[in-house]
Regions:
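Extracellular jelly-roll beta-sandwich "head" domains, especially the C-terminal globular C1q domain
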Residues: 1-125
Length: 125
């Protein structure tokens, strides 16, 4: 992922998708019904060329609006395959709303480790 641009993170594996709410083609969660949903994510840093990268993550509603409480950043020195961000928030959704995971790097580019970056959501109310 390059520097200075929020990028939707493609997820390579679906561990649980019993209700079919995760759209793997478009890499986002689609609310099946109206309600309150709990979302979370883990982003694991993987070095490209420099450990000076500063990693951010967030959850985004319908491709444009950052969900309140979902933004996180690690601003200390990063260690490849050890530095991680954990995000968690709740949000009211209408059936058909989408939620996606986005990542961002400051200072230097980097990767989000595919085998340990995760995104999840469930209806709680």
């Amino acid at each position: 992922v390059g520097v200075g641009t929020w990028t939707k993170i493609g997820l390579n594996n679906t561990d649980y998708n019993d209700q079919g709410a995760f759209d793997a083609v478009n890499n986002h969660f689609v609310a099946p019904v109206d309600g309150t949903y709990l979302f979370g994510a883990t982003l694991l840093y993987k070095i490209n060329a420099s450990a000076t990268a500063r990693m951010r993550g967030r959850l985004v509603l319908n491709g444009t609006t950052e969900i309140r409480g979902s933004l996180g950043e690690i601003s200390a020195t990063h260690v490849s395959l050890a530095t991680a961000i954990w995000l968690q928030t709740m949000v009211p959704l209408t059936a058909g709303d989408t939620v996606e995971l986005q990542g961002y790097f400051r200072v230097a580019d980097g990767y989000f480790a595919a085998d340990h970056t995760s995104f999840w959501g469930c209806k709680v109310g």
